[in-house]
A protein has these predicted regions:
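Active-site C-terminal subdomain of aminotransferase-like
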Residues: 177-180, 184-288
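Short glycine/serine- and small hydrophobic-enriched flexible loop segments
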Residues: 32, 59-63, 249-254
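Conserved C-terminal alpha-helix-loop-beta "cap" of PLP-dependent enzymes
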Residues: 74, 89, 223-237, 258-361
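Conserved N-terminal alpha-helix of the aminotransferase class I/II PLP-enzyme fold
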Residues: 6-52, 64, 68
Length: 361
């Protein structure tokens, strides 16, 4: 089925109303049950993935600033951390928007707020008036979570216009279930839009991205010229398959909220065990306690072990600084034990090889 258009509006193409209702219910589950939106106070659609969702969000906010505040492109800037998904570089290039990378601490992966404070002052002095910020609910490499409260407090202290899109491509189907104090949702008035990938934690077919935004903002990108389409089209992609929406709806209903929570908690238990064991071996790593990503400092683990267990490097160009473990359902206890045994053996060999030098000293 072709799910072209935006089905959160009353009028849409009548040919596939049955499957469109499933997409609407999928949006309801995600917006209302997971991200705490007020019923019927949001728009959204099932996109091709996180890249399209990020593009859709920044496009909407660019047009919002132009339509509502008469902004010019060079008065708008996009801010995101250096750990943010690479799609933002594409987005800014295509939309012809300037951007600034926000520095993060090497160990904590937290945005450096002192530098951000200085940057905001510099940008305002240079004539930048309108800010679009992409914050992360689970970065690709680290699973790190940006501090939305501190960032928005800083923005308000500078008295600037800002819109915030939450890139929850990875974390959106785990973090809200594992962290009862999650503030990345529509109860937070500073959150304007959220996107989450179904093909990551839910293992829905590629590519499945779910884009959600507060009601009415998406009107800024209505394509008036699509007059031959029954209904309204506000989407970047236009025609799109309804199959992914149907599959994701079925997966969520198969699990149920309790089943999905139990599933994610099992991944956290395994991640906790890996981290506890690595700490006992004096292996340095980064992990957010509510996420299933464990990222190990490269100097504490040899490449041969990383490649044996298909850990993901932060770069394929030169020497990686970090190696990533993503704890999914296939990561069973036997695999975890084998990995930790290999790391233990490596650490023991390293200590043994150091002993002769230590004796000389």
């Amino acid at each position: 089925p072709n799910h072209i258009g935006l089905h959160t509006y009353e009028k849409s193409i009548s040919s596939f109303q049955g499957t469109q209702k499933l997409e609407l219910d999928l949006l309801r589950i995600c917006a209302e049950e997971i991200f705490k939106a007020v019923p019927n106070n949001y728009d959204g659609y099932v996109a091709s993935g996180g890249t399209e969702c990020n593009m859709q969000a920044v496009w909407i906010y660019r047009e919002y600033y132009k339509n509502v505040l008469d902004a010019k492109n060079d008065e708008i800037i996009v801010l995101f951390s250096e750990d943010t998904h690479y799609s933002l570089f594409k987005v800014c290039n295509i939309l012809q928007l300037n951007f600034k990378l926000l520095n993060v601490d090497f160990n904590s992966r937290e945005i450096d707020f002192e530098k951000l404070d200085n940057l905001l002052s510099e940008l305002k002095a240079d004539g930048v008036k309108y800010f679009i910020t992409v914050l992360n609910m689970g970065t690709t490499m680290f699973g790190s979570i940006d501090d939305i409260d501190s960032i928005t407090h800083l923005y308000k202290s500078h008295n600037i216009q800002f819109k915030i899109h939450v890139d929850a491509a990875f974390g959106g189907f785990i973090y809200p279930f594992t962290n009862p104090n999650n503030v990345f949702n529509f109860e937070n008035p500073n959150v304007d839009s959220i996107s989450v990938d179904g093909h990551k934690m839910l293992q829905a077919p590629y590519g499945t991205g779910i884009f959600l935004i507060r009601k009415g903002l998406i009107d800024n990108v209505l394509t008036e010229e699509a007059s031959y389409i029954e209904g309204l089209d506000h989407t970047l992609c236009g025609s799109r398959s309804g199959a992914n929406a149907i599959a994701t709806w079925m997966i969520l209903n198969m699990h149920g909220s309790k089943g999905l929570m139990d599933h994610m908690e099992q991944l956290i238990i395994k991640s906790d065990f890996i981290c506890k064991s690595l700490s006992e071996l004096d292996v340095q790593f980064f992990r957010n306690e509510y996420m299933n990503i464990v990222t190990i400092l490269s100097e504490d683990i040899p490449r041969r072990i990383c490649e044996k267990y298909t850990l993901v490097p932060d770069t394929h160009k030169g020497q990686p600084k970090w190696w990533k473990i993503v704890v999914m359902e296939h990561v069973n206890w036997q695999l975890i034990d084998n990995f930790l045994n290999d790391v233990t053996q490596y650490k023991n060999e390293t200590i043994h090889n150091l002993r002769p030098n230590q004796a000389i000293l």
